[in-house]
């Protein structure tokens, strides 16, 4: 059964959280930062350090029922991934934010906004979001990227990220963090490439079907994002800046899902 009563009530309660979680802290989406070459050990450390920072800002909600629900879906997807039979140990976190978004940190740390749970119509749509983010991790989109920042100071990168998380409600703080000479060009680090997004879609749909979820769930959730694109016009919300949902992407996801048949 999708979204037990208590779980759904909890998600709506999180949506009603005060403005601190919605304005003062605005977690950047990190599904596929570019141009940073990392070893698996560095990936794990980076992800763990960022999660630690989020806990310090009370951005992660310790709701056992919802976290267990997301983890059950996520682990089911990971277990069905024949392409990556030895994935990292995924850790799933509920984020106190009413906006639709999810993000993947290196090392297998997946954040899921409360607003995404409320927006989803069924469990397959939630699975589509989780499968996409897991695929960013298993395909190692961070570590695969190459560039001049290969030898960059990871600790400094974490510091810049923490400053942006803490100061997202203050444009001056964000601009100050981005202007640091040691900031490793943060905007490029968190920018999604279309190639990575499409690859995460392809691998995500495959593991959805293998896990028994309706692979059309990913495309149907993209449709919700496309509707938001029309609603917001040029003032796109965070997830649409990082996860563009154009008609081509929706069509490709629909066509690929159809190859697996209904579930």
Placement of each model-derived feature along the sequence:
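Bacterial N-terminal signal peptides that target proteins for export
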Residues: 1-8
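N-terminal signal peptide c-region/cleavage motif recognized by signal peptidases
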Residues: 16-18
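Peri-catalytic and regulatory segments of divalent metal-dependent proteins
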Residues: 22-169, 186-192, 199-263
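Phosphoinositide system proteins, centered on phosphoinositide phosphatases
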Residues: 171-179
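Active-site-adjacent, His/Asp/Glu-enriched structural segments that form or flank metal-binding
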Residues: 178-181, 196-199
């Amino acid at each position: 059964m999708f979204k037990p009563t208590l779980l759904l009530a909890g998600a709506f309660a999180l949506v009603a959280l005060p403005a601190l979680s919605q304005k003062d802290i605005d977690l950047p989406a990190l599904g596929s930062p570019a141009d940073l070459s990392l070893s698996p050990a560095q990936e794990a450390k980076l992800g763990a350090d960022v999660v630690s920072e989020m806990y310090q800002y009370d951005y992660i909600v310790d709701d056992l029922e919802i976290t267990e629900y997301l983890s059950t879906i996520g682990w089911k997807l990971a277990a069905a991934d024949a392409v990556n039979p030895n994935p990292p140990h995924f850790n799933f976190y509920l984020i106190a934010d009413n906006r639709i978004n999810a993000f993947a940190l290196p090392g297998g740390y997946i954040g899921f906004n409360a607003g995404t749970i409320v927006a989803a119509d069924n469990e397959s749509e939630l699975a589509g979001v989780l499968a996409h983010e897991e695929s960013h991790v298993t395909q190692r989109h961070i570590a695969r990227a190459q560039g001049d920042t290969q030898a960059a100071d990871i600790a400094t990168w974490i510091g810049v990220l923490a400053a942006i998380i803490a100061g997202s409600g203050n444009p001056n703080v964000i601009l100050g963090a981005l202007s640091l000479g040691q900031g490793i060009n943060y905007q490029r680090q968190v920018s999604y490439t279309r190639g990575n997004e499409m690859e995460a879609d392809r691998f995500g749909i495959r593991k959805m079907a293998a896990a028994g979820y309706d692979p059309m769930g990913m495309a149907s959730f993209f449709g919700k994002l496309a509707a938001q694109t029309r609603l917001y016009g040029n003032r796109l919300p965070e997830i649409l800046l990082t996860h563009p949902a154009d008609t081509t992407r929706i069509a490709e996801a629909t066509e690929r899902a159809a190859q697996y048949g209904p579930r």
